[in-house]
């Protein structure tokens, strides 16, 4: 009988090392999330973090804009067409299922948020790489301003078109007298 191995084929030391590696992967305060938060704060936007009463616990919640921002890792959320999203060669069935479930969960949460009247914006990790970062952040700022203006614009009566100019109207009034 071989000692030191469990049924999964890993030694207790390997199992502890894997546990430590997985524990080091954080879901809050990630580098991409901090980049977005720092930019928004510098531009005067105020927000809440990981709102626990909303589906999916959005990374950034902007109540004034009724907008939730999700900063997603390309691998964990299955960013199609991205170089950072590749299914590992080992245990592929597990990873395909895991990522498919993550994508399905993300989709359902965004549908719930939309039904509640929230706008959802997803920013991918690869969009915050140095060469694309500024373009992404400026587009985010533009989108937030657009959302605010659309949601808060007043509905005025449609502009009434006059076919005569004011001077023409005055001349016809003088001719009548």
PLM regions with names:
Residues 2-122, 126-177:
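Nucleic-acid endo/exonuclease domains
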């Amino acid at each position: 009988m071989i000692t030191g191995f469990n049924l999964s084929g890993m030694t207790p030391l390997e199992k502890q090392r894997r546990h430590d590696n997985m524990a080091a992967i954080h879901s809050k305060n990630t580098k991409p999330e901090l980049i977005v938060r720092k930019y928004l704060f510098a531009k005067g936007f105020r927000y809440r973090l990981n709102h626990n009463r909303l589906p999916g616990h959005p990374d950034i919640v902007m109540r004034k804009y009724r907008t939730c921002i999700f900063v997603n890792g390309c691998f964990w959320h299955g960013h199609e067409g991205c170089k950072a999203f590749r299914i590992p060669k080992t245990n592929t069935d597990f990873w395909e299922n895991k990522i498919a479930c993550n994508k399905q969960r993300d989709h359902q949460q965004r549908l719930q948020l939309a039904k509640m009247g929230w706008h959802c914006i997803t920013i991918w990790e690869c969009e915050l790489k140095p060469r694309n970062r500024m373009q992404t952040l400026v587009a985010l700022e533009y989108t937030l301003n657009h959302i605010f203006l659309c949601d808060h614009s007043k509905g005025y009566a449609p502009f009434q078109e006059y076919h005569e100019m004011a001077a023409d109207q005055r001349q016809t009034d003088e001719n009548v007298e």
